[in-house]
Amino acid sequence: MKYLSEMNRMYSVSIGITTNMGVSATSWIAQNADSLDARSIWVGEDIALGQETFVLTANTLSQTKKVRVGTGIIPVTVHNIVTLARVGITLSELGDGRFAFGLGIGGIQDLERHDIKIRKPVTELRKTIQTLKRLWAGETVDSESEVFSITNFGLNLTEPLKMPIFLGVRGPQMLRLTGKIADGVILSGPFDYLKNAIKIVDDAGEEVGKEKGSIEKVIWVPTIPTFKGIKEKVARRVVALVIADTPDAVIDMLNVDIERVEKIRATVAASSPKEGAEHVDDELLDVFSISGTREHMVDRFEALEKIGATEVVIGPPFSGDWRGATTEIFEEVRMRMRES
C-alpha cells in the first residue's frame, strides 16, 4: 500500500478523539490509524470527564507506530505547570519524536462550568509557554502568573527537550501570539473565520522572522458523516454546543442570523445542547460543521486546504457506523490524491 504521506499532497487528514469517549472507541482509532494513513491523532480533553488525558495520550502512542499523537488541547488553567513540564518529557520520550503538545486556555463553556476565571488569558498562555520552554531548555526557573507560581525549579535535564508546540486559540490576540511563539495552531470555526485566522497567524509568524507557511494549521471542526447512520439531530446538537462556545468576536465576522444564534446560546445556557439543537437550521449546520456524504465532506476538506489548512481532523462526534464512515472518508481522500 502506498501511503498518503508518500504522495504529493498539500494537506493531511487526521482523527480526533476526546477523553469522554470509551476505551473501545479510542483504542480502535489508535489501532487503525496507521493503516488508514492518518497524519495524526489529536486527543482533546473534556475537563473532568471520561478517561485521564495523559494516560489516554500515552496509550495512544503505545498502540501506534507511525502517526503523530498530540494533545488538542490541554487547558493550562486546570493543570499544574510542573506536571505539564514533566508530561512533556515523558510523552516525548515514549513517542520517540511523534508527540506534539497542544495547549490552550480552555473552552468558554468548560471554564464557566468549573467556575474558572482568567483576567488576562493572553498573558497567561504566553507566560505558561515561555516558562515551559525555559524548563525544557534545562533552565532553573522562577516564574508566576494568575494560576501558577514556581521558585528555583528545574527538571535536571541532561540535554534540551524539543517538541512541537501547538496552541488551540480563537481571538485575534491569541492568534497573533500563536504565530509568534508556537509551531502550529489548532483552529475551529466557520470557513470565513478560519480564512482570517490563518492569515493572522501567518502574518504574526512572518513578523518574527518565521518562513512563510512554516506554521502548521490544523482545522478541527465537527465532522458528521450522515451517510453512515449518524442522525442529523446529533449533528444539530453538536452545532448548538459549538455555537454556545464560540466567542462574540468570531460570530461578528459571520453572515448569519444573529437573533437565532443568541436564541441557541440562551437555550444551551438555560437547559442543554439538546434543547438548543431545535433552533439550529440548515444554514447554521453547514456553517459550523462538515457533514453529508463522503464526497461532500472531502470537498470541504479541499476547500479548507485552499484557505491555508495543512491538516484536517475527522471527528468527533462518533455515532452510527462511524468506523465504516471513517474508513470510507480516508478511501475517498486516497482516491483523489492518486488522481491529482
Can you say where each PLM-predicted feature lies in the sequence?
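N-terminal beta1-alpha1-beta2 module of alpha/beta enzyme domains
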Residues: M1-G72, M163
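An alpha-helical appendage that flanks or caps ligand/catalytic pockets
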Residues: K2-R9, R119-G154, N196-K306
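Acidic (Asp/Glu)-rich catalytic clusters
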Residues: Q31-S35, T57-R68, G88-F99, G179, ...
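Glycine-rich, proline-tolerant flexible connector loops at the mouths of alpha/beta enzymes
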Residues: S40-Q63, P75, L111-E112, G189-D192, ...
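Short, acidic/polar
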Residues: M21-A33, L84, G168-K180, V234-R236, ...
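Alpha-helix-loop-beta-strand connector modules within alpha/beta enzyme cores
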Residues: Q51-I74, E124-T131, L135, E328-S340
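Active-site mouth loops of central-metabolism enzymes
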Residues: Y11-S24, I74-I81, E159-R170, T223-I224, ...
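Hydrophobic faces of well-ordered beta-strands that scaffold small-molecule active sites
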Residues: Y11-I17, I41-V43, V69-G72, F99-L103, ...
